[in-house]
Design a protein with these regions (language model features):
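Cysteine-dependent deubiquitinase/ubiquitin-like isopeptidase catalytic cores across multiple families
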Residues: 2-143, 147, 159-162, 166-470
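Stable alpha-helical elements in mature extracytoplasmic
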Residues: 153-154, 223
Length: 470
């Protein structure tokens, strides 16, 4: 990026999307990690000297000056590989920014293998006007711009859960951006039909199971269903997924059926809770509990945001929520699995890949149509992951975005990663002890479906005849 482009982009951001400033003394919570909002003031020692060029002796500096100087030093970086200007990061604590940047960020992408449109007459009306217009002359979608934000937010949830499982919560992108485990996770979400959690897989499964036409916006429940089913089909992910029903109830008996095997061993399980916390806005009685959900060490974030515009929320401070925004269109992320990928995934084509030679689409089903220059030779599939730092940088950002809780849409998807039974007990205690009205309810057992009779109830029915009536 040249200087003119960088300056132009900075001017546009300043006027139309200004970066938030660190204007609160409340602690910052990011997926269970607490950060102080201000770095400690600089305290001189007898051996300290004035930094070069300041012209101010240490004894004459105020706490405010030290804090400003520290903030400037924290953000004094060279331009990032993804083209972001470090000046926009403001005076946020560097440890918080490092953690924020380490979260995997999925956005709109363009130029990928086409996803064929549905031939169902209802499909067109299910798309937004913008999506219809930008794909008017195309038989398929080569970009998910305009309809894929909830899918991308769902990918963020799943990708960060897998990253924490493989690298731990304390791994930082800045220290080892090309770590093998990191590249392996990124490859799972490549914009390619062969990637197990690609946009193609989500759209295909949404059409087959959730009644979502290609190009139609997903809701939280459809995203959760796709995550659960796609993970179930890809055992190499090493994860189980539990999805709550129509409400915010988590049933312990059903959860343990998924999380605990026959030997009593607990497997890492992603809990997805789809809920609605109000009509048009989040009801204030839920505010404290929603903030507390991001303070739990099991939190993997929240997918939601505004009507038909989903974000991935990872942090909170006072009544503000910080998020990763998927509404930036970038070139496709190529599929580059490592050599340790399972032979079954490489050798055996999925249903989606097997249908990739077809160009027809009926009802709500979808077909992937590869172009000639996008087909990877079989010999390339098993090569070690070769993502460049520039490609990896498109999946991370230090650019903070913030939204007041009163501006958030009440429909959302909450995510928690439970790695053991002790972890589950800790999480259960946490959701039950929040202030205000809880956003998640843990019940011992799932109630029997309505209309299902209790066993033995028919034997307790007493018959009456006319002679027995008084």
């Amino acid at each position: 990026m040249n200087d003119f482009e960088r300056v132009s982009r900075s001017i546009v951001r300043t006027f139309y999307d200004p970066p938030p400033t660190n204007d609160s003394n409340d602690p910052i919570w990011l997926l269970g990690q607490r950060y102080d909002p201000r770095p400690p003031p600089w305290k001189p020692t007898p051996n300290d000297t004035s930094p070069a060029g300041t012209g101010t002796p240490p004894s004459e500096r105020t706490d405010d000056e030290s804090w400003i100087r520290t903030s400037i030093e924290e953000t004094d970086r060279k331009e990032a590989p993804n083209g972001e200007d470090p000046a926009q990061y403001g005076n946020w604590p560097s440890a918080f920014l490092d953690d924020f940047e380490s979260r995997i960020w999925m956005t709109y992408r363009s130029g990928f293998t086409p996803i064929q449109k549905s031939q169902d007459p209802k499909a067109t009306s299910a798309m937004s006007f913008r999506v219809r217009m930008q794909n008017l002359a195309s038989p398929g979608f080569t970009s998910d711009t305009g309809f894929g934000c909830m899918i991308r937010s769902g990918q963020c949830i799943l990708a960060n859960a897998l990253q924490i499982l493989r690298l731990g919560r304390d791994w930082r992108y800045q220290e080892q951006p090309d770590a093998k485990e990191h590249c392996d996770v990124v490859a799972m979400f490549a914009d390619d039909p062969r990637a197990p959690f690609s946009i193609h897989r989500f759209v295909e499964h949404g059409a087959a199971v959730c009644g979502k036409y290609p190009g139609e916006w997903f809701g939280p429940s459809a995203a959760a269903r796709c995550i659960q089913d796609l993970v179930h089909k890809n055992r190499e992910a090493g994860l189980k997924v539990y999805v709550s029903g129509d409400g915010a109830d988590v049933y312990e008996d059903k959860l343990k059926e998924i999380a605990v095997d026959d030997d009593g061993e607990w497997h890492p399980t992603l809990i997805l809770v789809g809920t609605r916390l109000g009509i048009d806005k989040i009801t204030p009685v839920y505010w404290e509990a929603l903030k507390a959900s991001l303070q739990m060490k099991q939190s993997i974030g929240i997918a939601g945001g505004r009507p038909s515009a989903s974000h991935y929320f990872v942090a909170t401070q006072a009544n503000n929520f910080f998020y990763l925004d998927p509404h930036s269109t970038r070139p496709l992320l190529p599929y580059r699995p490592s050599s340790s990928s399972t032979e079954e995934q490489v050798a055996a084509p999925s249903t989606l890949e097997a249908s990739a030679t077809s160009v027809t689409s009926t009802s709500s089903s979808t077909t992937i149509v590869p172009s000639a220059n996008e087909v990877t030779a079989p010999s390339d599939v098993s090569k070690p992951s070769g993502y460049s730092l520039e490609e990896l940088a498109t999946c991370h950002t230090r650019r903070i975005r913030r939204l007041q809780i009163r501006e958030m849409d009440p429909s959302m998807l909450l995510a928690f990663l439970i790695t053991s039974e002790d972890d589950y007990e800790d999480w259960k205690q946490g959701v039950r002890s929040v202030q205000g009205k809880s956003v998640v309810h843990v019940q011992d057992k799932e109630p029997a479906p309505r209309g299902q009779e209790r066993e033995g109830a028919i034997d307790e029915v007493e018959s009456w005849d006319e002679d027995g009536l008084q």
